[in-house]
Amino acid sequence: MDRETFNRWLASYGSAWTGRDPGAAASLYADDATYQVTPFDEPLRGRAAIYEYWSGVARTEEKIQFEYEILAVTAEHGIARWWASFVRVPPGLATKLDGIFLISLDSAGRCRSLREWWHKRQ
């Protein structure tokens, strides 16, 4: 992986999230990708499961903002810090997240694995 590819993937991830587009989000992942939302949850497995997860996000979050900063890129992984804010619906609860991604991409630039650690303030 190189920095440019990782940056492009993160920008596309942010666009899919802020655009509330589960299809665009799922298209960023390999067919057999894993997505671990928190370190204590079992990872989602496969693009269909990731699509279902992002469908829920699209239904329950509005006014989404997303930013990121690349911290490191190796041949195997990219690490980024990210920030997001949104309004959870219902009940209209303002939410801020601050997190870290550990991401592995395949040769086509699709995510093979994503692990994240984040904190929430509401």
For every predicted segment, state its role.
Residues 14, 39, 70-72:
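Structured beta->alpha junctions
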